């Protein structure tokens, strides 16, 4: 039987073989395709990729952060999650208050210049310490703008009210499961210019059939090697959590990507991953005593039977 991970591996192959060379915002360069879809049957295992280690702890803590409506990296740092650091750090080193060494283009320079990387690492550690320990600094520079959590939980209306999209969609799933309006959007055009990173995973929709909850994500932009493995696991986890509260089984996670791209400095890593054979997907177990999705904490989420190939490191394009 075909392993479900081939959905992702086939995406990698397709883009490597048929992708168009494009320039990008980060200056790194990519090959990309437009419009690609993958499907994962969540009843047959939790799609945490096995051809390289994907850290479930980071996936889960980021999702819980989104669900809390938080937009400050302090919560993530408190959970030893550094995946958003670079975007907050960028706003700090570009501010008038920053007086340290020049950090222009720190993403590329830290990959190419060992001497600069030492300076960068030192400044990043100081930045993280300040976010964790200084409330005023954290409020100003740990804040990422009105990113995912704010849009999910407190979308501002023109009337000055706030909409809790995530809470509302859960109630709709319970009361009107056949609705075609089971949608949450993170793309708020008015807020996009002030966000540290405009939403890559833009909009998701739920679908209930035969007692099963499915989810489709539309992702405007997908970093295939680093980002998409996280997105697959994150929205699969979200589907499990909401199905749990609503008394449903899990169905499919459908992942639709607009610009699906591989950065040119990830080619070697992708080839290494493609040479590996997938292993069985793990099982996700949720604490049955937790009834609301908003009450889950890290200790309530357990992954069992995860035996991946080793991690493959790659630089992040900022």
From Swiss-Prot:
Q: What is its EC number?
A: 2.1.1.45
Instruction: Tell me the GO molecular function terms.
Output: thymidylate synthase activity
List GO terms (cellular component aspect). Answer: cytosol
What broad class describes the main subcellular location of this protein? cytoplasm
Where along this sequence does the record place binding of (6R)-5,10-methylene-5,6,7,8-tetrahydrofolate?
Answer: 223, 317
Q: In which pathway does it act?
A: Pyrimidine metabolism; dTTP biosynthesis
Q: Which PROSITE patterns match?
A: THYMIDYLATE_SYNTHASE
The reaction(s) catalysed by this protein are: dUMP + (6R)-5,10-methylene-5,6,7,8-tetrahydrofolate = 7,8-dihydrofolate + dTMP
The superkingdom of the source organism is Bacteria
Q: Which InterPro entries match?
A: Thymidate_synth/dCMP_Mease, Thymidate_synth/dCMP_Mease_dom, Thymidate_synth/dCMP_Mease_sf, Thymidylate_synthase, Thymidylate_synthase_AS
Compartment(s) where it occurs, according to its Swiss-Prot or TrEMBL record: Cytoplasm
Assembly behavior: Homodimer.
Name of this chain's protein: Thymidylate synthase
């Amino acid at each position: 039987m075909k392993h479900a991970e081939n959905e992702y591996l086939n995406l990698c192959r397709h883009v490597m073989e048929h992708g168009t060379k494009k320039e990008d915002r980060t200056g790194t360069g990519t090959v990309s395709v437009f419009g690609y879809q993958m499907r994962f049957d969540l009843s047959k295992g939790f799609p945490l990729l096995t051809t390289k280690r994907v850290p479930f702890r980071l996936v889960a803590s980021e999702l819980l952060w989104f669900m809390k409506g938080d937009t400050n990296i302090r919560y993530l740092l408190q959970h030893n999650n550094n995946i958003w650091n670079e975007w907050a750090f960028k706003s700090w080193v570009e501010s008038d208050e920053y007086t340290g060494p020049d950090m222009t283009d720190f993403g590329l320079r830290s990959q190419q210049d060992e001497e600069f990387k030492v300076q960068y690492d030192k400044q990043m550690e100081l930045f993280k310490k300040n976010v964790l320990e200084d409330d005023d600094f954290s409020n100003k520079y740990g804040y990422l703008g009105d990113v995912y959590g704010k849009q999910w939980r407190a979308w501002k209306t023109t009337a000055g009210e706030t909409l809790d999209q995530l809470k509302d969609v859960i109630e709709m799933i319970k009361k009107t499961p056949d609705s075609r309006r089971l949608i949450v959007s993170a793309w708020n055009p008015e807020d996009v210019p002030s966000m540290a990173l405009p939403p890559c995973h833009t909009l998701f929709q739920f679908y209930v059939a035969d007692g099963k909850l499915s989810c489709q994500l539309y992702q405007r932009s997908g970093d295939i090697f680093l980002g998409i493995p996280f997105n697959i696991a994150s929205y699969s986890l979200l589907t499990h959590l909401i199905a749990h509260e609503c008394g449903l089984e899990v169905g499919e996670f459908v992942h639709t990507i607009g610009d699906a791209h591989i950065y040119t400095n990830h080619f070697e890593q992708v080839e290494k991953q493609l040479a590996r054979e997938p292993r069985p997907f793990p099982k996700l177990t949720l604490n049955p005593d937790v009834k609301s999705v908003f009450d889950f904490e890290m200790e309530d989420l357990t992954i069992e039977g995860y035996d991946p190939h080793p991690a493959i490191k790659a630089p992040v394009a900022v």
